[in-house]
């Protein structure tokens, strides 16, 4: 059966938590109103997707399978010039923040969500990423030999046929809330935090759907580089990435400009909202020093 968005949200929380939850618990965890949760729980009970104890049934698990995330793809090829001097000898995703590599905060969440396939696209000092295979033996590493000649669309070009039911993650994000990486996703989406003003990459939305990507804005969502593409959009991206990459000026594009700007008419991407302390993007060496005082010497 096809689930409504609210049914999906409640069912995935119940599956993830694997413990008896009250409707108040479900409201707090989902951000839905108590009235909406009450109505949704009744629907799930009537369909035998949960039992009287608010635990998921076999039928409930089966109903989630079409929404299962198949893989997580990490874009990790760039130099990270604004993080010099630390990136002169270490790729930015492998920089330690409070004793843990930046990319490992993401990888641990992917493993926790039981996502079966993990791909890392490397470039600058790519051989150093092999150290991750000791802790994460199922990682597949793909080398982008053109990382220094083109923007990150060159990394997306290499994995364009693997984007169906897949997360795409920038590898320089420090993740504090692992629940942002989920076993199931309802629809194609991009992570964002609501802000009153920003000078960073952001997007405008209408009824929860991204309508415009831009740099700087008011009353908008600041972008974070974690997105998900369902089967339909993943297949479309395969075609669009190839077309844009091979067009004049295409190699200068950021890869996410394809679904959010250049070819946005082909997609319906929703914003998945995160909170202030869920995730941090470290752009500069000064920002790194503020987060981890060990570098402030």
Residue map of PLM features:
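Conserved beta-loop-beta/alpha segment of the NTase-like Rossmann-fold superfamily
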Residues: 130-201
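Conserved alpha/beta core of the MobA/IspD/sugar-nucleotide pyrophosphorylase nucleotidyltransferase superfamily
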Residues: 15, 55, 61-72, 223-297
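N-terminal glycine-rich phosphate-binding loop and ensuing alpha1 helix
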Residues: 11-14, 63-126
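Conserved core of the sugar-phosphate nucleotidyltransferase
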Residues: 9, 177-249
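Key DNA-contact positions within bacterial/archaeal DNA-binding proteins
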Residues: 35
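Short amphipathic alpha-helical interface segments
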Residues: 2-32
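A short, conserved structural fragment
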Residues: 45-54
């Amino acid at each position: 059966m096809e689930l409504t968005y609210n049914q999906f949200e409640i069912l995935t929380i119940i599956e993830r938590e694997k413990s008896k939850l009250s409707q108040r618990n479900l409201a707090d965890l989902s951000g839905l109103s108590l009235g909406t949760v009450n109505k949704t729980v009744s629907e799930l009970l009537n369909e035998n997707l949960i039992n009287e104890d608010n635990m998921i049934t076999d039928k409930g698990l089966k109903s989630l399978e079409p929404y299962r995330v198949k893989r997580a793809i990490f874009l990790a090829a760039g130099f990270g010039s604004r993080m010099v001097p630390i990136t002169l000898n270490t790729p930015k995703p492998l920089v330690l923040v409070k004793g843990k590599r930046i990319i490992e905060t993401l990888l641990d969440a992917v493993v926790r969500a039981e996502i079966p396939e993990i791909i890392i696209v490397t470039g600058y000092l790519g051989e150093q990423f092999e150290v991750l295979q000791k802790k994460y033996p199922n990682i597949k590493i793909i080398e982008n030999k053109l990382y220094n000649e083109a923007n990150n669309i060159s990394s997306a070009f290499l994995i364009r046929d693997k984007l169906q039911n897949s997360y795409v993650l920038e590898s320089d994000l420090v993740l504090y809330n692992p629940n942002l990486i989920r076993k199931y996703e309802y629809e194609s989406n991009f992570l964002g935090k609501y802000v009153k003003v920003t000078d960073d990459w952001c997007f405008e939305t209408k009824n929860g759907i991204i309508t415009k990507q831009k740099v700087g804005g008011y009353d908008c969502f600041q972008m974070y580089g974690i997105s998900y593409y369902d089967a339909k959009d993943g297949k479309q991206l395969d075609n669009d990435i190839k077309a844009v990459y091979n067009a004049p000026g295409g190699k200068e594009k950021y890869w996410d400009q394809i679904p959010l700007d250049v070819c946005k008419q082909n997609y319906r991407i929703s914003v998945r909202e995160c909170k202030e302390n869920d995730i941090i993007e470290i752009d500069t060496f000064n920002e790194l020093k503020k987060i981890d005082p060990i570098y402030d010497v």
